[in-house]
Amino acid sequence: MRLLPRLLLLLLLVFPATVLFRGGPRGLLAVAQDLTEDEETVEDSIIEDEDDEAEVEEDEPTDLVEDKEEEDVSGEPEASPSADTTILFVKGEDFPANNIVKFLVGFTNKGTEDFIVESLDASFRYPQDYQFYIQNFTALPLNTVVPPQRQATFEYSFIPAEPMGGRPFGLVINLNYKDLNGNVFQDAVFNQTVTVIEREDGLDGETIFMYMFLAGLGLLVIVGLHQLLESRKRKRPIQKVEMGTSSQNDVDMSWIPQETLNQINKASPRRLPRKRAQKRSVGSDE
């Protein structure tokens, strides 16, 4: 009975080994075949991916060419080689916020045909993307004919918004014109990044309001202190002390004539005790 568990353990160990030895090379070949088939499928998929990438790379140049052609067709009009433009800022290239900025644009016709200058416009744009408008100013209609070998000067002014102070923006100034054949041209007279300056001189609305508020607050403090002092004075009434005349020296007798003073002094001597006693005796007799 003790040997049965040992025999069962040996059978469990020996049986799998015999199965493996019997299957031997065939089993190994089957495993190898499966591995090779998997590798072939992986290689095929890699080759297909490379072919797809090559096709995409071949298609990309054609797409870029098409995009460039579309941009050329749908792009904005360019400047004419027969015309020149110049710009001059009246107060220098300083752009104070909430203040007028003036500039002059000169147009020179170097060709043999007339040019019709239609309009002049300006706009602030996002510095990183000039297609994004921040502030678009009103276009100035001109409709001026400039003959060949002649010049013309145009004035334009705009006011940067006050909240734009202290920030950089792209300033674009365009001059739009055409020839007698109807060909439209546009010259970017100015196309640079500028900084709008915060306005420091003068008083703005916020500063005035702050001063008015401080003045009103100071007035209220003064009125409050005055009322407080008045209330304290009312709570402590002044005690009136009656001062009598202790002697004639305290009485001003200068306004009384001297004769009258002499009579008063004679008529009001101090009564003697004898006279008082006589009066008392007379009264008792009665």
From Swiss-Prot:
Predominant subcellular localization, coarse grouping: endoplasmic reticulum
Disulfide bonds: none
Residue stretches spanning the membrane: 208-228
A Gene Ontology BP annotation from the UniProt entry: cotranslational protein targeting to membrane
Cross-referenced InterPro entries: TRAP_alpha (IPR005595)
Family assignment from sequence similarity: Belongs to the TRAP-alpha family.
Name this protein carries in UniProt: Translocon-associated protein subunit alpha
Modified residues (Phosphothreonine): 260
This protein's UniProt keywords: Calcium, Endoplasmic reticulum, Glycoprotein, Membrane, Phosphoprotein, Signal, Transmembrane, Transmembrane helix
Skewed-composition ranges (Acidic residues): 39-75
Domain-level remarks: Shows a remarkable charge distribution with the N-terminus being highly negatively charged, and the cytoplasmic C-terminus positively charged.
Origin: domain of life: Eukaryota
UniProt function note: TRAP proteins are part of a complex whose function is to bind calcium to the ER membrane and thereby regulate the retention of ER resident proteins. May be involved in the recycling of the translocation apparatus after completion of the translocation process or may function as a membrane-bound chaperone facilitating folding of translocated proteins.
Glycosylation sites: 136, 191
A cellular-component GO term for this protein: endoplasmic reticulum membrane
Side Lumenal, residues: 19-207
Signal peptide positions (record): 1-18
Misc note: Seems to bind calcium.
Compositional bias (Basic residues): 268-279
Chain spans, region Disordered: 39-83, 261-286
Membrane topology, as annotated: Single-pass type I membrane protein
Keyword Glycoprotein in record: yes
Subcellular localization, as worded in the UniProt entry: Endoplasmic reticulum membrane
Residue spans, topological domain Cytoplasmic: 229-286
Sites of Phosphoserine modification: 247, 268
Subunit structure, interactors included: Heterotetramer of TRAP-alpha, TRAP-beta, TRAP-delta and TRAP-gamma. Interacts with palmitoylated calnexin (CALX), the interaction is required for efficient folding of glycosylated proteins.
